[in-house]
Amino acid sequence: MLITKIFKDYRLFEIFILGIVSGMPLVIIFSTLSVWLKESGIDIAVITTFAVARLSYSLKVFWSPLVDNFKIPFLSRWGHRKSWLILCSSLMVLVLIAMSKENPEVSLTSLYFLTIALGFLSSTFDIAVDALRIDKFDQETQTIASATAVFGYRIGMLITGAGALYLAEITGNNWQLTFVIIAIIFAVATIFIITVNEKELVREKVNITSIISWIYAVINPFKDFFKREFAVTILLAVIFFKLGDAMLGAVASPFYIELGYTKGEIAIIAKLYGLIATLVGGFAGGIVMYKVGNFKGLIITGIAQSLTHFAFIWLNHQPPSFEALLIAITIENFAAAMGATALVGYIGNLCNKKYSATQYALLSSSSSLCNNTVTIYAGKLVNMMGWDGFFIFTIILALPALFILMYLNKKVNV
């Protein structure tokens, strides 16, 4: 079992802890913060503009060479990768403490920029963690190392998702204390990072030749992808496929609060149980793809994930109850995970094996970048359309991807 291997191999334990730290800021930005803002009386249109902090996760590829090559003064003696981890983790402690001192009702702008800073530091931390993991393990053990990192990432998401919401609930809405405790966890993690063993590699000095080589290494996979027929159309299908889900996710937590659900209920059902439904749905999506193939699997899961948004319209007209939220979360998370699994398989199938890593990054980053940009306006749409109208709109958003995929299936082998 994975858990047994983590505690037998200390290197895996290190990656597991780093994975936890990586996963923690993401949920603060994507969900937990929106609950705090909603409870503080902030308008939904303003809340979703905080999604701009997510853009760092989509754009981090552009400063990853800096993390690879720039030595941080003083800290680099601990190790190149560790120096970046220590810097980012330490700064995240300061940002979280600063966030704990803010009151959204009177200092929303400060909180906005602190959230953007947290997103940037977190995404940079992710770059260094991935690099450290790749450096520490050989090719044969990369799979188990990646699985360990993902497992840790999920635990981190639970800590700042379900854990933070439940903590805020039992402390009587004390969000300031909640963020201080999260900051303390990061401070402890920073101390742990200092003890992590880093495999120091001989690094080539950066010169004009290496820079040119790197540019070609980035450009060639892009050129290869866009040389293919219907490349832009394929890219549009990938972008639209999860757009409706992204819009729904941006407003889900404030929606639950508006319906009258407590933070404790959201923590247990939407976050903790929701993760289980997501994992089961991901497994089911893999089975569907295996049984019916890439294209049919993508269409089936695409239709399923869009139609499940009707569950939120139903939820909007139910009195707050444990059972109603459980049903809606089960349906939505299960179908969304099926769709996500199908999309990963489809993107992987599109990539030229020669440039698989870069082309996969191009397609997945394009999707997340567009999704994170558009979700900024989700709150305004809720105010314009009302909740029912908004959920219908998220269902309609899936249609372009499905029509494009059907069109492509007739024209090319996708």
Swiss-Prot record:
Gene Ontology terms, MF aspect: transmembrane transporter activity
Keywords: Cell inner membrane, Cell membrane, Membrane, Transmembrane, Transmembrane helix, Transport
Keyword Transport included in the entry's annotation: yes
Membrane topology: Multi-pass membrane protein
Transmembrane regions: 15-35, 44-63, 84-104, 109-129, 150-170, 177-197, 230-250, 268-288, 295-315, 324-344, 360-379, 389-409
UniProt-listed Pfam families: MFS_1 (PF07690)
Listed name of the protein: Putative transporter AmpG 4
Native source species: Rickettsia felis (strain ATCC VR-1525 / URRWXCal2)
Designated gene of the protein: ampG4
